[in-house]
Amino acid sequence: MGLLSILRKLKSAPDQEVRILLLGLDNAGKTTLLKQLASEDISHITPTQGFNIKSVQSQGFKLNVWDIGGQRKIRPYWKNYFENTDILELAELLEEEKLSCVPVLIFANKQDLLTAAPASEIAEGLNLHTIRDRVWQIQSCSALTGEGVQDGMNWVCKNVNAKKK
């Protein structure tokens, strides 16, 4: 197969689309994380009123990342976004029936701060070791510096691929 044939095949094969919900409490760094994934400027972040959506290419996937506001008044509306979700980011939503068997990625964000709890401590506090109905990962990261963010997205792509097979 020549180079031209390979390029045509790659161009004709559409990226598999994956929907990711980015949920968390207000001021957790969700929007910063989203902008970091999209390689956008993170110097001016304001609280999300409603939601933001960005599409990011990664490992043959088109990742449609939904950043849903975390303020108390918005949280009751989170359920409206659950349909067709491929990856879940917030451990508190494990009990939701619509999300059963959906892989869970928990970003232990703000690891650039001296006061940040280590990922192992967060995993223990959330009793993640008791999760048996799905795969899960806790990923140390700093949305501000970008450290650990791509590692988390690599895990997402690997596990969505496994789930879709």
Curated annotation (Swiss-Prot):
Q: Entry's InterPro entries?
A: ARL2/3, P-loop_NTPase, Small_GTP-bd, Small_GTPase_ARF/SAR
Q: Which SMART domains match?
A: ARF, SAR
Annotated compartments: Golgi apparatus membrane; Cytoplasm, Cytoskeleton, Spindle; Nucleus; Cytoplasm, Cytoskeleton, Microtubule organizing center, Centrosome
Recorded hits in Pfam families, A to Z, give: Arf
Q: Which GO terms describe its molecular function?
A: GDP binding; GTP binding; GTPase activity; microtubule binding
Question: How is the protein disposed in the membrane?
Answer: Peripheral membrane protein
- This protein's source sits in the domain of life called Eukaryota
Which residues does this entry mark as bearing Phosphoserine? Answer: 5
**Keywords (A to Z) from UniProt:** Cell cycle, Cell division, Cell projection, Cytoplasm, Cytoskeleton, Golgi apparatus, GTP-binding, Lipoprotein, Membrane, Myristate, Nucleotide-binding, Nucleus, Phosphoprotein, Protein transport, Transport
Lipid attachment in record (N-myristoyl glycine): 2
Choose one Gene Ontology CC annotation of this protein and give it: Golgi apparatus
- Subunit-level organization: Found in a complex with ARL3, RP2 and UNC119 (or UNC119B); RP2 induces hydrolysis of GTP ARL3 in the complex, leading to the release of UNC119 (or UNC119B). Interacts with RP2; interaction is direct and stimulated with the activated GTP-bound form of ARL3. Interacts with SYS1. Interacts with ARL2BP; the GTP-bound form interacts with ARL2BP. Microtubule-associated protein. Does not interact with TBCC. Interacts with RP2. Interacts with PDE6D; the interaction occurs specifically with the GTP-bound form of ARL3.
Q: Which family does it belong to?
A: Belongs to the small GTPase superfamily. Arf family.
| Entries under NCBIfam families matching the protein | small_GTP
Q: Function, please?
A: Small GTP-binding protein which cycles between an inactive GDP-bound and an active GTP-bound form, and the rate of cycling is regulated by guanine nucleotide exchange factors (GEF) and GTPase-activating proteins (GAP). Required for normal cytokinesis and cilia signaling. Requires assistance from GTPase-activating proteins (GAPs) like RP2 and PDE6D, in order to cycle between inactive GDP-bound and active GTP-bound forms. Required for targeting proteins to the cilium, including myristoylated NPHP3 and prenylated INPP5E.
UniProt-recorded name of the protein? ADP-ribosylation factor-like protein 3
Organism listed in the record: Pongo abelii
